[in-house]
Amino acid sequence: EQVPGLFTTSRGIMGYGVSTGAAGGMSLRGIGGSPTAGLLVLIDGHPQYMGLMGHPIADAYQSMMAEKVEVLRGPASVLYGSNAMGGVINIVTRRQQEEGVKTNMQVGYGSYNTLQTEFSNRVKKGRFSSVVTGSYNRTDGHRPDMGFEQYGGYAKLGYDISSFWKVWGDVNVTHFNASNPGTIQVPLIDNDSRITRGMTSFALENHYEKTSGGLSFFYNWGRHKINDGYQI
């Protein structure tokens, strides 16, 4: 038998939340922290974390934008800084490699009025490529006052300058509303979050037979409105 090395906590059907009562905590080989300040999340090599608390916000990531997920287990602070004490998770975004157009759509509906919808369109024509994705997810939750709603979009444009050089830029925006009723023993009233997260990046890359390199710039931003039940 094998023991999993990566763990992620969940508090309900959908949505991890932030602040008091939040889930989405991740740990690699027992290291991660609560909140997850000891495990670094990257998107295409760019750090993703909330500036105030220093931890990633799991509800800000969209599955349709991801081509693959790379996991580096063990301390990696020499390369990635103090947030990578437990390891690194790198989300690699989609790229259209084959000539043509591909469109995908996923829709699911289940208990507690839970709805999941995702859409993606990928284009490759000559030297030009693009990826556009969108999603809308919601649920009433398995308890009263535990609703969650999320909608977001992602777009990437790329251009092959030559066989060895390419340039691309992308933007990702996600907004979600989450409610937390607290525990049955200690209920919370109006513990709501209204959070918008965004990122944009630009990169120039080269790939030769024996060498490769790149120059990239990125900018992350967010707006958070949180009523976490503190009493004065």
Regions found by a protein language model. Give the residues of each.
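Residues on the lipid-exposed face of transmembrane beta-strands in outer-membrane beta-barrel proteins
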Residues: 30, 119-123, 155-159, 202-206
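Short strand-turn segments of transmembrane beta-barrel domains in outer membranes
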Residues: 76, 88, 92-123, 133-134, ...
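Extracytoplasmic beta-strand/coil segments of soluble accessory domains associated
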Residues: 2-46, 67
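Outer-envelope beta-barrel architecture signal
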Residues: 37-39, 99-103, 115-117, 126-130, ...
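Flexible loop and strand-edge segments within Gram-negative outer membrane beta-barrel domains
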Residues: 139-146, 150, 160, 164-214, ...
